A protein has these predicted regions:
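Membrane-anchoring hydrophobic helices of lipid-metabolizing enzymes
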Residues: 1-46, 51-62, 86-93, 112-113, ...
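Arginine residue identity/basic-tract feature
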Residues: 4, 35-37, 41, 90-91, ...
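Catalytic core of membrane glycerolipid acyltransferases/transacylases, capturing the structured
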Residues: 6, 41-107, 154-165
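Short, surface-exposed, charged/polar-biased interaction segments
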Residues: 15, 31-34, 68, 81, ...
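Phosphate/oxyanion-binding active-site loops and adjacent basic polyanion-contact surfaces
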Residues: 22-24, 56, 103-111, 138-143
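Flexible loop/turn segments at secondary-structure boundaries
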Residues: 35, 53-57, 80-84, 103-105, ...
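Membrane-associated lipid acylation/remodeling enzymes share a hydrophobic transmembrane-juxtamembrane segment
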Residues: 69-76, 113-189
């Protein structure tokens, strides 16, 4: 369970990271934020955001934190569980999952049970619906695996009122596009 201290640290890190590549000013509709607040406080909820660049994962938590939301548990790939970052994210509600675990029934069952527990307790959840970033500013095809587990978890937990909230993160400029072009021309990552 996230603690206030680690959520404060994560919010500070999100603000710093957003300021590295962009001016740090996030624009959003306060009316939409209030509508989402009402839903998240009343119903089990999942906020699914678009993923076009590295910093997308910082945008949603920063807006939620700045607007005094109950902070969501967020799903990310196991590749994010690196020293320091993994330590921080876990303590702020991060849940690292493998990219593929089709043959591991115990892993599937454990994940479904944990998601069911989060929904039963009405902890909001968030993740990138595309599963990975596009790096070009375009949307990738959605990955339905985690959403399927959320729906199954809701069913097993008896949660019939789950709300899926789409969140679009847009930019005037995608800085990852230049890096991606270099990688495609043969420059190593």
């Amino acid at each position: 369970i996230p603690t206030r201290f680690w959520l404060d640290v994560l919010a500070k890190v999100c603000g710093i990271c957003l300021g590295l590549g962009y001016d740090g000013a996030l624009q959003y509709d306060p009316k939409d934020v209030e509508r989402v607040r009402h839903i998240v406080r009343k119903y089990p909820s999942a906020l699914l955001w678009t993923h076009k660049t590295y910093i997308d994962g910082f945008v949603v938590p920063k807006i939620l934190f700045d607007n005094n939301f109950p902070m969501p548990h967020f799903f990310g790939g196991a590749n994010l569980n690196v020293p320091i970052l993994g330590f921080l994210l876990r303590r702020a509600g991060g849940i690292f999952i493998r990219r593929s675990f089709q043959d591991n029934e115990i892993y599937k069952l454990s994940l479904k049970q944990y998601i069911g527990y989060l929904m039963e307790k009405r902890f909001p959840m968030t993740w990138s619906f595309e599963g990975t970033r596009s790096r070009l500013g375009k949307l990738m095809p959605p990955k339905y695996g985690l959403l399927k587990y959320v729906l199954e978890g809701a069913h097993h937990a008896g949660s019939q009122d789950i709300h899926i909230i789409p969140v679009s993160v847009s930019y005037d400029l995608i800085r990852d596009a230049e890096e991606y072009a270099r990688e495609q021309s043969g420059t190593p990552k």
